[in-house]
Amino acid sequence: MVYKVKSHVAGQVWKTVAKVGDQLAADDVIAIIECMKMEIPVVAPVAGTLVELFAAEKDIVAEDQDIAVVQGV
């Protein structure tokens, strides 16, 4: 099953931790968003493979914006 991963807050992508093709465990950090001087992790909802990453470092993202797609195992 394919899972879309969304940003829970509006802010700037401070760091992308995972790369397309990476194998992820549930709750692995995909990216970190800076919002009001706080770092908010965007995590994988399930174990699987990161198949798409829509945001790059320094991109501005909106709340509920798609950040990534994970193909579950």
Short names for language-model regions:
Residues 15, 41, 59:
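Active-site-proximal flexible loops/turns
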Residues 34, 39, 52, 57, ...:
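Acidic-residue sensor for enzyme active/binding pockets
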